[in-house]
Amino acid sequence: MKVAFVIRKDCKRCATIAKSIIELIPPDWEKIYDTEAAKFLGGVGKDITEISADIIIAIGGDGTVLRILQNAKGPVLGINMGGLGFLTEIEIDEVGSSTYKLIRGEYKINEAMKLKVYINGRRLEDCTNEAVVHTDRIARIRQFKIYVDGHFLTTIKSDGVIVATPTGSSSYSSSAGGPLLLPTVRGMVISYLAPYSSRIKPVVVPSESTVEIKIAGNDQDSLLILDGQKEYKIKSGDTVSISMSEEKARFVSFRESIYDRLRDKVIKHVVN
């Protein structure tokens, strides 16, 4: 078994959690550290783009998990070090018991949809949560034309447009008023950031669809942001194309059902 450890930047506490896991796992398991983890744990660290493992343990939060999914290869086990951590599987007080489950093989690998994204036909990195087209300056509304499978859907004036996966529907899209999609739903959510008209509502389209966002008007420079990790400048006349990727995001899970995650990570926080 090859296990990789990736931790949040400058997080000594994350390294302490990693060390506690290392002390429990079998000595014959091969251990790999990213450059950040190696600072605290010793040894030679690998750049995250060079990491490939049977299990990648992400210690930090959703940002750490998304960074792994965009750059490394292997199913991810996320440990939440604070915040909601919807993409993480376990909390700090569950590390010991979950490590023993990992050793015994009492887990499953869940796959989730990823998006492939193009600017004017040039393919970029895939993303797991969402692709966001956003104004490049604060308080400067933009005009976007949206097409689904080549059919014109709408022209919208807003601060931005979000196209989210079922996994990402609980994140940025949700804060923009988009619906929650269960991971088993084959769809994408198109939602809008501060639309000029309140009559414009989010739309769910089939996962097999291709969504195109065209930057309309003059002097409409904007940004394309993938999972909050990668950022690209786009200008008037550019077209962003988004569709389902051939690749999948893979997560290590100890939960019995997707409803456990929904309850623990979303509903419980809303109710409380």
UniProtKB/Swiss-Prot annotation:
Keyword Transferase annotated: yes
One Gene Ontology cellular component annotation held by this UniProt entry: cytoplasm
Coarse class of the protein's main subcellular location: cytoplasm
EC numbers: 2.7.1.23
Any single GO BP term: NADP biosynthetic process
Keyword list, A-Z: ATP-binding, Cytoplasm, Kinase, NAD, NADP, Nucleotide-binding, Transferase
Entry GO MF terms: ATP binding; metal ion binding; NAD+ kinase activity
Binding site for NAD(+): 62-63, 67, 129-130, 140, 157, 159, 170-175, 194, 229
Places the protein is found: Cytoplasm
Entry keyword DNA-binding: no
Catalytic reaction annotation: NAD(+) + ATP = ADP + NADP(+) + H(+)
Coiled-coil regions listed in the entry: none
Record-linked Gene3D superfamilies: Probable inorganic polyphosphate/atp-NAD kinase, domain 1, Probable inorganic polyphosphate/atp-NAD kinase, domain 2
EC primary class: transferase
Cofactor requirements of the protein: a divalent metal cation
Active site location: D62 (proton acceptor)
General function of this protein: Involved in the regulation of the intracellular balance of NAD and NADP, and is a key enzyme in the biosynthesis of NADP. Catalyzes specifically the phosphorylation on 2'-hydroxyl of the adenosine moiety of NAD to yield NADP.
Recorded family membership: Belongs to the NAD kinase family.
Full protein name: NAD kinase
Species, as recorded: Thermoplasma volcanium (strain ATCC 51530 / DSM 4299 / JCM 9571 / NBRC 15438 / GSS1)
Classification lineage: Archaea, Methanobacteriati, Thermoplasmatota, Thermoplasmata, Thermoplasmatales
